[in-house]
Structure formats: structure tokens, C-alpha cells
Amino acid sequence: MAETDPKTVQDLTSVVQTLLQQMQDKFQTMSDQIIGRIDDMSSRIDDLEKNIADLMTQAGVEELDSENKIPATQKS
């Protein structure tokens, strides 16, 4: 097997390290974007749930222990 030039090994090592760092940076950027979008989606869902609850209150609908809901005017 032919001997490998130490300079070539150092260059290759440097290139691989640079490539890995670039990949890690891109992965971190994408991860941050995904987490930001998940947080945004969570806030939107919370707002939507609040708006639905407000609309139900305005419409006179009250939640029961079960999943069924009836207007407050029909209660005994």
C-alpha cells in the first residue's frame, strides 16, 4: 500500500471537519426554524381554543361532563 502524504491527510481532515461543521450549522438552523414554527402553531392553537370557548359562551352553550353539549336554555 502506498504511503499517504501527511499534508494530504491534513488537508482531507480539514475538508471533512469543515464539511461536518457546515452540515451541523445547517441542521441547527433548520432545527431552530422547526421549533419556531411549532411554537407559532402552538400559540395559534391556543388562540383558536380561546376563541371557540368565547364563541360558545356567547352562544349560550355550556360544556357538560361528557362530550355532548346542549344550549343552556334547554337545561332543566
Swiss-Prot record:
GO BP term (any one): axonal transport of mitochondrion
Nucleus is among the record's keywords: yes
One Gene Ontology molecular-function label: transcription corepressor activity
Compartment(s): Nucleus
InterPro entries tied to this protein: HS1-bd
Keywords from the UniProt entry: Nucleus
One CC-aspect GO term: axon cytoplasm
This protein's record includes keyword Nucleus: yes
A Pfam family annotated for this UniProt entry: HSBP1
Family: Belongs to the HSBP1 family.
PANTHER family: HEAT SHOCK FACTOR BINDING PROTEIN 1, HEAT SHOCK FACTOR-BINDING PROTEIN 1
Role of this protein: Negative regulator of the heat shock response. Negatively affects HSF1 DNA-binding activity. May have a role in the suppression of the activation of the stress response during the aging process.
Subunit record text: Homohexamer. Associates with heptad repeats of HSF1 trimers and probably also HSF1 monomers, and with HSP70. Association with HSF1 trimers and HSP70 coincides with attenuation of heat shock response and the conversion of HSF1 trimer to monomer.
Protein name per its UniProtKB record: Heat shock factor-binding protein 1
Organism lineage: Eukaryota, Metazoa, Chordata, Craniata, Vertebrata
Gene name as annotated: HSBP1
